Amino acid sequence: MKLKAIELKNFRNYEELKLDFHPNLNIFLGQNAQGKTNILEAIHFLALTRSHRTSHDKELISWSQQEMKVSGVVEKAHATVPLEVQLSPKGRIAKANHLKENRLADYIGQLKILMFAPENLELVKGSPATRRKFMDIELGQIHAVYLYDSMRYNRALKERNAYLKFDKDKIDKNFLSVLDGQLAEHGNKIMLERQNFIDKLEVHAKKIHEQLTHGKENLKIIYNQNVKTDFSKELLSRQDHDIFRHQTSVGPHRDDLQFFINEINVADFGSQGQQRTVALSIKLAEIDLIFEETGEYPILLLDDVMSELDNHRQLDLIETSLGKTQTFITTTTLDHLKNLPENLSIFHVNAGTIEQEQ
């Protein structure tokens, strides 16, 4: 899978922009706050219809404009697929092959991406919400049905939480049980998919982590399900508690992940270097896992992470990705990028203008 070209209209600081990409490696070079990350954000938006930097869509639209559009051409093994995502006061429209997709689950996965940004280093030591988002994004690209169940679960969760905010004497437990059934139906599928994903991810990540640490460290990933027994029974047993607290206290929306090196919890006791190595091992593992599950390698987006990694980890990242994935890198300097291949494109970014090095 390759992204051949992208076109932006009123996206962030780009009023009009068209770029053709190298099928192997693309580097965006420039000082901070010039618009490098905006390009990777646009690719992320084209793939997932969402930004990785903000949940406020209005921030993506250029100043004084009312709408924006990101379009691109994706080259797959047996087809070339034009993609387009628009934002306007009327909402969001996603198109594949010039046809509007009414369901997000039918669009996501057309362009598979793997984003590695400084905030991804928070995967190990950040909040549980960060790790749940990680599972949701990656699984949503691999299995469309997961995205469908996740959306249905979140809709039911929102409805149940809103109902729990009613006065206690106005709550009908029979209706609450109906909502419980909807949560359990989709929540059970989510938990099963997450467990299968983590089991497979761990297999790949363990091998990579062992290579990165020269056999000195053994990585283990634990999926901590919030639901310990039967989801339906736990929801029923907690109804009074949830009515009192005005929120749903059990379910996959409270799941988490834990990472261990040689039986030591990395988040609590690992060094910063160990935490970074775990995050890197997981990202590199995803490359092969996505290919294993879908038959397509994802596009790799490296947003200013090279400066966060030492030379050894930089080399491991580049060597693992090149030859498999089309890679996009943003950086302020090429000094720390060693052993770059000759077949690449370098784009110089300055104040929202981009020039390709000849």
From Swiss-Prot:
Molecular function GO terms recorded: ATP binding; single-stranded DNA binding
Gene Ontology terms: biological process: DNA replication; DNA synthesis involved in DNA repair; double-strand break repair; SOS response
PROSITE patterns: RECF_1, RECF_2
Primary site of residence: cytoplasm
Annotated compartments: Cytoplasm
Swiss-Prot/TrEMBL keywords: ATP-binding, Cytoplasm, DNA damage, DNA repair, DNA replication, DNA-binding, Nucleotide-binding, SOS response
CC annotations in GO: cytoplasm
Keyword ATP-binding included in the entry's annotation: yes
Gene3D superfamilies: P-loop containing nucleotide triphosphate hydrolases, RecF/RecN/SMC, N-terminal domain
Pfam (any one): SMC_N
HAMAP family: RecF
PANTHER family: DNA REPLICATION AND REPAIR PROTEIN RECF (PTHR32182:SF0)
Protein name in the entry: DNA replication and repair protein RecF
Biological source species: Lactococcus lactis subsp. lactis (strain IL1403) (Streptococcus lactis)
